[in-house]
Swiss-Prot record:
Protein name: Glycine cleavage system H protein, mitochondrial
Record-stated family: Belongs to the GcvH family.
Gene Ontology cellular component terms for the protein in this record: glycine cleavage complex; mitochondrion
Record's cofactor remark: Binds 1 lipoyl cofactor covalently.
Quaternary state and interactors: The glycine cleavage system is composed of four proteins: P, T, L and H.
This protein's encoding gene: GDCSH
One family name in Pfam for this protein: GCV_H
Major site of localization recorded for this protein: mitochondrion
Key words, A-Z: Lipoyl, Mitochondrion, Transit peptide
Residues the record lists as N6-lipoyllysine modifications: 94
Disulfide bonds: none
PROSITE patterns, alphabetized: BIOTINYL_LIPOYL (PS50968), LIPOYL (PS00189)
Domain Lipoyl-binding residue range list: 53-135
Amino acid sequence: MALRIWASSTANALRLSSATRPHFSPLSRCFSSVLDGLKYANSHEWVKHEGSVATIGITDHAQDHLGEVVFVDLPEAGGSVTKATGFGAVESVKATSDVNSPISGEIVEVNSKLSETPGLINSSPYEDGWMIKVKPSNPSELDSLMGAKEYTKFCEEEDSAH
């Protein structure tokens, strides 16, 4: 447990140190996987809001920097999440990173496939690799998140700074 806490603090909020990041060209492959119609947090989670439910996962950019995902720690359905607060963790061959919720709400479903096949986050971050589904308690929180173009620019600037 102490090792997990240490690793989580080392790779806090999916921001890996430049020593563990591979060097990318200014437009790495991840930018082709920033999807329109989703909202993005600066901690590299995405939200797809449909009706009364929002699906949350980590972005392709995040999984690309993490490397091969080997374990996912998720909460149980029925609990709640708070905006900008951790709800789970992703362990990869490189590091362990906390996953923050971009919005607040009640967890209505958890992707149980990730316990058996955590690599779905790598192979399909926006489809099969989703993490939780939430009934938003404050849908206006979505307005503070980035669209695809803003998120792409954010990633470019973040990568060029490292």
